[in-house]
A protein has these predicted regions:
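Terminal beta-strand-rich extracellular "head" domains
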Residues: 94, 118-180, 186-187
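Extracellular structured ligand-interaction cores
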Residues: 55, 109, 215-219
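Hydrophobic residues positioned within well-ordered beta-strands of beta-sheet architectures
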Residues: 114, 136, 216-220
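Beta-strand-rich, repetitive solenoid scaffolds
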Residues: 1-7, 12-17, 21-28, 32-46, ...
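Short, solvent-exposed secondary-structure boundary motifs
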Residues: 1-8, 21-26, 41, 83-100, ...
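Surface-exposed ligand/attachment interfaces on beta-rich extracellular proteins
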Residues: 1-3, 65-75, 83-108, 117-146, ...
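Short, surface-exposed beta-strand/turn "edge" patches of beta-sheet domains
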Residues: 175-209
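Short, structured beta-strand segments at or near domain termini in extracellular proteins/domains
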Residues: 211-226
Length: 226
């Protein structure tokens, strides 16, 4: 092994171990990083690689760009996973959310995938019949982009259990849609007569003291603002 220096390369470590060329240990004599003899890969054997500054990450700038279009960034600067609480809401309404409410999310870069279930758990009050129903509580604000890359992305929606039905069989939602610059989803269905996609309304919810009602399962992927 040798330690050298050149004006161009700076400090040079040259290892010649039978197993590893470079081994870094902590004060407890635990190996935390190593490079195999003759190898070029760096292995972190204990702990994690921690980005100490927000917005920094792994830069894939050495890779080729797209075959069509133009790349704007090759920096992977975020990963996160966790839970969130989706709840029904409608302007002016008081809605008691049910016991079958919960969700999970995963964020890779600015791409967010959420899944969840939500329901109502009691009688509702206030509200206006024609006002849209929302699922609120998204973990990240939807990107406010109007150029096409994030124009109201849609996801899957299912009301699996008929025992927890909605008020009108024909108006049960089948799609969730993210809304630019917001932290909620809209629900919608295809009208049986006109075939148009219509936002689910407050009067589409089944008003019942039973728990749960209006049970729904959903997932959606969208681009986050940050």
């Amino acid at each position: 092994a040798a330690i050298g220096y050149t004006a161009a390369e700076g400090l040079i470590l040259t290892g010649q171990g039978s197993t590893d060329d470079v081994t870094i240990k902590n004060d407890a004599d635990t190996t935390v990083l190593q490079v195999a003899t003759g190898g070029v890969d760096v292995e972190i054997t204990a702990g994690n690689l921690i980005m100490g500054t927000s917005g920094k990450g792994i830069d894939f700038g050495a890779t080729a760009g797209p075959t069509a279009g133009s790349g704007t960034s090759e920096l992977l600067d975020d990963y996160e996973e966790g839970t969130w609480t989706p709840v029904y809401a409608s302007t002016g309404a008081t809605i008691t959310n049910g016991s079958t409410t919960g969700g999970a999310y995963r964020k890779i870069g600015s791409l967010v995938t959420v899944q969840g279930s939500t329901s109502t758990g009691g009688a509702m009050s206030g509200g206006t019949a024609g006002n849209p129903v929302r699922i609120e509580g998204l973990p990240f604000t939807v990107d406010d982009d109007t150029s096409g890359e994030n124009m109201r992305p849609t996801g899957n929606f299912d009301t699996w259990n008929s025992s927890y039905q909605w008020a009108e069989d024909g108006d049960q939602p089948s799609v969730v849609s993210a809304v630019n610059n917001q932290v909620y989803l809209y629900l919608s269905y295809r009208d049986a007569v006109d075939k148009y996609r219509i936002d689910t309304r407050f009067d589409d919810l089944q008003d019942s003291s039973s728990n749960p009602r209006n049970l729904a399962y959903f997932s959606i992927t969208y681009i986050a603002a940050t």
